[in-house]
């Protein structure tokens, strides 16, 4: 049994989702968004770090999973996204959590069944898979998708290994 924290990073809105994996069963524990209010990027990064730290303290996850940087429409957006990811990852590493990264297409594949799924499809499937009474916010649904992707990837690796061992830890550990 493990608690997985999934993060969908963003410099303005960072989604988070927390699930408990017990064998094949996934249980929803919580989700939401860290909304930054600072105008300058360093202030927003500080808010992301503090928000992720608060979530880690509240839920005590065993694993931290985050979406990889995708190629944004412009370099400035990609850099800001990378910095937001960095703030979240530093919080995880400071709490001695193993860090795993997943590409957006792999996350969508794990949740919806196709890497080209849109946000509405991800929201619908996350609601269905976790038996939620309502659709989660888009960024929170994406973060729950990251956590679900890790849970499914971890289950597959355990099955392939033929024993109950964890997947290789991320490079940030």
Swiss-Prot record:
It is found in: Cytoplasm. It comes from Vibrio vulnificus (strain YJ016). It is an enzyme of class 3 (hydrolase). GO terms for biological process: DNA recombination; DNA repair. Mg(2+) 1 binds at residues 8, 139. Binds 2 Mg(2+) ion per subunit. This is Crossover junction endodeoxyribonuclease RuvC. Pfam families: RuvC. The keyword S-adenosyl-L-methionine does not apply.
């Amino acid at each position: 049994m493990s608690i997985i924290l999934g993060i969908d990073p963003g410099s303005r809105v960072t989604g988070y989702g927390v699930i408990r994996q017990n064998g094949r069963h996934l249980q929803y524990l919580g989700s939401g968004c860290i909304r930054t209010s600072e105008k300058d990027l360093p202030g927003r990064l500080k808010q992301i770090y503090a928000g992720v730290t608060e979530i880690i303290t509240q839920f005590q996850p065993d694993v931290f999973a985050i979406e990889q940087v995708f190629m944004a429409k412009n370099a400035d957006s990609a850099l800001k996204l990378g910095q937001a990811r960095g703030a979240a990852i530093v919080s995880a590493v400071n709490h001695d959590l193993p860090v795993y990264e997943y590409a957006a297409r792999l996350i969508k594949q794990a949740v919806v069944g196709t890497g080209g799924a849109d946000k509405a499809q991800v929201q619908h499937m996350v609601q269905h898979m976790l038996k939620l009474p309502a659709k989660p916010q888009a960024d929170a649904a994406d973060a729950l998708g990251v956590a679900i992707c890790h849970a499914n990837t971890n289950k597959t690796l355990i099955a392939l290994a033929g024993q109950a061992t964890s997947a290789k830890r991320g490079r940030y550990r």
